[in-house]
């Protein structure tokens, strides 16, 4: 499911006269409206596709995350800001708003410190990317793959209880490395892993959930092994869910 509900684009030249503002708006306004139209069209296509293939129905896992989001965010829920003014970007960040900076020839000297994402050509953006940017700001795991029975998504700290149960079976760790015995160390490792793998490489080892129940049933993904150029693909399925096709 999509958590991004609204995209707001602001173009604002710093210290410009009224005439300069009009020229500025004319120069960048067309690109802004083109993006908004594209986002609207792409979102409609996604909703239609989900309804057609039956994936539009919320699974247990998706509903749980949505309910958590609704209780944690208020008026700014689901909104991403795209701005080209450094001061405005800082104001929004201080308010806890997700921000993407639009960089162009007229704002090269402005300060966008703290903004986690930026683009030079907004016409290259699409809804899927903006959804991912929004999720990064509000700490919602990216969904990697959805099948009829499973949801593959980024791992979060709430998964650890279930993962410890899965890895407690000796057959699971026979050919793969287990978790840290100390919960605190595993949480610290997951935090570093999220920042250094998910945020930087946009891939890694993910969590597999049963769509019907939301139960964590295993892990799958890619690992970078020392001495090898290409990532290694691997998976772990909890014993109760093995041999089910």
Each predicted region: which residue ranges?
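Conserved acidic residues
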Residues: 77-79, 116
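Short, well-ordered alpha-helix to beta-strand connector turns
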Residues: 6-7, 96, 115-116
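A short acidic, often aromatic-flanked loop/helix-cap motif at beta-alpha or helix-coil junctions
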Residues: 56, 65, 108-109, 123-128
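GNAT-family acyltransferases
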Residues: 41, 122-240
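Acidic, Mg2+-coordinating phosphoryl-transfer loop and its flanking beta/alpha structural elements
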Residues: 81-113
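Short acidic-hydrophobic, aromatic-tinged amphipathic segments that line or gate anion-handling sites
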Residues: 117-121
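Substrate-recognition "cap/lid" segment bordering the active-site pocket of phosphatases
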Residues: 21-43, 54-77, 241-243
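Asp-based phosphoryl-transfer active-site loop
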Residues: 4-13
């Amino acid at each position: 499911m999509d958590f991004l509900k609204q995209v707001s684009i602001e173009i604002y030249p710093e210290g410009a006269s009224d005439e300069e503002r009009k020229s500025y708006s004319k120069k960048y306004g067309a690109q802004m409206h083109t993006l908004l139209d594209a986002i609207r069209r792409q979102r409609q296509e996604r909703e239609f596709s989900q309804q057609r293939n039956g994936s539009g129905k919320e699974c247990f896992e998706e509903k749980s995350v949505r309910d958590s989001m609704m209780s944690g965010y208020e008026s700014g829920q689901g909104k991403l800001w795209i701005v080209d003014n450094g001061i405005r970007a800082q104001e929004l960040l201080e308010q806890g708003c997700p921000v993407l900076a639009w960089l162009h020839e007229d704002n090269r000297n402005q300060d966008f410190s703290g903004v986690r994402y930026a683009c030079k050509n907004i016409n290259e953006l699409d809804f899927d990317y903006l959804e991912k940017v929004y999720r990064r700001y509000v700490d919602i795991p990216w969904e990697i793959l959805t099948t009829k029975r499973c949801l593959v998504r980024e791992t979060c700290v709430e998964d650890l209880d279930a993962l410890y149960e899965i890895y407690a079976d000796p057959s699971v760790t026979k050919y793969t490395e287990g978790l840290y015995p100390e919960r605190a160390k595993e949480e610290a490792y997951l935090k570093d892993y999220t920042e250094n793998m998910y945020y930087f490489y946009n891939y890694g080892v993910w969590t597999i959930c049963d769509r019907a129940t939301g139960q964590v049933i295993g892990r799958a993904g890619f690992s970078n092994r020392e001495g090898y150029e290409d990532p290694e693909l691997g998976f772990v399925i909890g014993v109760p869910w093995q041999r089910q096709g």
